[in-house]
């Protein structure tokens, strides 16, 4: 990368956390109206599993355990000029309560069956669902991943 690269042209690293409880996924609707899993930017020095747990708790007040790697998506949001590499993690919810934790970012949360997801989905989550990820994964395979 050249030293004079424009910061907006450098991809960001995001982390999404697939939270599963009783076969349902915890999803959040952001202020722009798109649904996805809890997630956010990886902070300096932070590992993806810690980021996934932190973001999930900040956005939904849900604690996750057994956090493990699922996939990576390459997400280009041309309309807003952003490019993300999203690291997808999966974790199990502790407890059964969830609430909007960060109202500045999140409008609504809910538990959904993988076969009955709300719309519109955020591009990141859409890419994962479609298997446009590494390692390649068709359809809903990430939701079948269970901790060892």
PLM-predicted stretches and their roles:
Residues 30, 34-35, 103-148:
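Nudix hydrolase/Nudix homology domain
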Residues 15-17, 69, 89-91:
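A structural signal for short, well-ordered beta-strand segments
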Residues 21-58:
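Conserved Nudix-box catalytic region and its N-terminal flanking loop in Nudix hydrolases
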């Amino acid at each position: 990368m050249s030293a004079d690269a424009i910061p907006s042209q450098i991809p960001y690293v995001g982390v999404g956390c697939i939270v599963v409880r009783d076969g349902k996924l915890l999803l959040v609707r952001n202020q722009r109206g798109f649904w996805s899993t809890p997630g956010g930017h990886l902070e300096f020095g932070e590992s993806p599993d810690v980021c996934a747990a932190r973001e999930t708790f900040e956005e939904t007040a849900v604690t996750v355990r057994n956090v493990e790697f699922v996939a990576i998506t390459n997400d280009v949001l041309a309309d807003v000029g952003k490019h993300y590499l999203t690291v997808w993690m999966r974790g199990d919810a502790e407890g059964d309560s969830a609430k909007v934790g960060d109202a500045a970012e999140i409008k609504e949360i809910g538990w959904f069956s993988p076969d009955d997801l709300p719309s519109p989905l955020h591009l990141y989550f859409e890419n994962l669902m479609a298997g446009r990820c590494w390692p390649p994964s068709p359809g809903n395979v990430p939701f079948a991943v269970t901790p060892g």
